[in-house]
Structure formats: structure tokens, C-alpha cells
Amino acid sequence: AHNKSIDDLISKYKIGGLIFFQGGPVRQASLTNRYQSQSKVPLFIGIDAEWGLSMRLDSTYRYPWNMTLGAVQDMSLIEKMGKQMGQQSKRMGIHFNFAPVVDINTNPKNPIIGNRSFGEDKFNVAERAVALMKGFQSEGLFATAKHFPGHGDTSTDSHHTLPVVKFDKKRIDDVELYPYKELIKNGLSSIMVAHLDIPSLESRKGYPTSISYNVVTEILQNDLGFKGLIFTDALNMK
């Protein structure tokens, strides 16, 4: 029944892509082939593989979490890891990895980022994110930096509520946006925008960054000069 509902989305609504959340590699590859054969325009296939395909698929390789990579001093090892993840993803027909996470983990009470972050230092985060991105993209896997403009210093989970970030624009530009600037300079393919309430960037009360013209168009595209693909975080988040 679930597979049929996806068939209908492809045939009736001409969706542009799919994201896989569970299953094994054989089933995932089979479903990808099924859906691609039904779509008149090739579908983009994405996955959250922050520490490898095993984040979502069983019987696949698992790599260290970003917190561990934050202590690795040899960037070539991180790039090599990204390259392997790229090879494995391409074999599965996956185009986008919704990674790396470039949130700077400056709030120890953060319930959702934590060990998914490279750490609390913006230079450390940016250097490792660039290495991982280069590894992905050397194999033709598009990297997607997230969660723009920065989910690191929040004390609530945006899957369940709308977190508020109270920093002023200068602090956000100096700290949270730093990794994005470095990744964009190095050829980043795509960015995922978070659902956040940031009064210093969006004056409308309770208006999420994911649909904010000022955040997405003025800051990300105009100020940072980003020309790649822009995703929002999941729309089924509360």
C-alpha cells in the first residue's frame, strides 16, 4: 500500500525526488529502480547518511559520528571517509547525502545536534565539513550542509517545536554562518534550511527561517552568493 502511494505521487503529481528512511540496501535499490522507471524525469534520490548509509539502512557501512571526527587531525582521513560514503551511495542510486551537519554545538543542552556536530569551534567545524564534502563530491554525491542558518545553539528540538535563536545578526554572521561561507567557497552543492525562529533575521513573530525571504533569498543567496540547490528540513516536523 505504501509503495502504491509513492507510485501515485510520481504519476499524478510529478514529484521531483524521494528520500529513504529505512530498509536494507537490496530493497532500497529495487524500490529506486521501480520509482525511476515510472518517472518521466529522473528522480533525485536523497538520504540522511551523516555517518554512512547505516544511519538509515541496515547491512551497510557505519562510520564515526561527527563528534569523533572533531578530534581527528588528519583531514585526508575525513576526505577518504567521505569518498567511500560517496562510492557506496552512488552504487545505491543516491544523488544527495543530507550531510555534513555544520551546526556549531555551543549549547550543551541541545537535544538534537550534540554528537552530530564536529564541535563548538567554528574553524574546527568548517575544516572537517569541507574535507567530508570534498570526499562526497569527488564521487559525484552531492553534499547538503545543514541546518542553515544554525541549529547548534538551541535548547529544543525542531522536530517537536519551533526553537528560538536569540543571537543578533552580527554574531550569527560571524559564528553560525562561517562554515557555510567556507563550504560555498569550496563548491558546495546544496544547503538544507532549518525550521527556526530567529527574531534578528526575521521580524515576523514565530515565522520559521525555512520560509523566510530574508533568510533564504537575502542572506543565503544574495549575501553569501549561494547558487546551489536549497532544501528545507522535513515538512512533517511539528
Predicted regions and their residues:
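Second-shell residues forming the walls of enzyme active-site clefts
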Residues: L18, V26-Q38, L43, L53-M55, ...
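A charged helix-plus-loop insertion that forms the helical arch/lid used to bind
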Residues: Y63-Q73, S117-G119
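Active-site-adjacent structural elements in enzyme catalytic domains
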Residues: P25-P42, Q73-G93
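A short aromatic-anchored loop/beta-hairpin motif
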Residues: S11-Q22
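Short, conserved phosphate-binding/catalytic loop or strand-edge motifs used
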Residues: V102-I112
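Short, acidic/polar
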Residues: H2-K12, L77-Q88, D173-Y180
